[in-house]
Amino acid sequence: VLNKEVIEYLGRIDWRFANDKPNMFQRPFTDVIAGTQAKDFGMYHTSLEDMHGTKGDPYLNTFGKWVFHLTAEKSKHAMVAPRRMYWNFYTPNAGPDWHCDEDTFGHCVSILYNLHTNDGGTEFETGEKVHSKEGQALVFPSHLIHRGFAPTEFYHRFNLNMIVHLKNYKNPNDK
């Protein structure tokens, strides 16, 4: 019931088109959407990002912290706090690209929480594919190369992607 409430809420917020490539490699948006075979990378909404001071949406952040605490209790990782919360939205037209969430090797993990069951999911560079199952939280090192894959039978896929500090995290901006 709570996941459905969050999806209803996500239907009323502002979204941005995602681009999984670093700025220097991004194509102009007009190129991304041009032609009959064009695919976007999906959409996202940021509700928390500590590196840019984004505190965002209290409702979404409260839900995200609930997911964080439940996941941290069951995880073998010594999780401290969420660093970033991205909410992803994919349609069948999305073609997300390979990326890593954070390249701080061993200092952060990603939590990918599925808000509903659908035929989209997450694919890792190793070839492993995990389909979206409601209530499932995937935990993996944030430096692993992965991508989302869009649903084909369902028209939408919603999930929460968090980057989480581990106890051994060292902020690269601290001297």
What is the predicted role of each segment?
Residues D50-K175:
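Catalytic core of non-heme Fe(II) oxygenases with the double-stranded beta-helix
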Residues V1-A78:
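Non-heme Fe(II)/2-oxoglutarate
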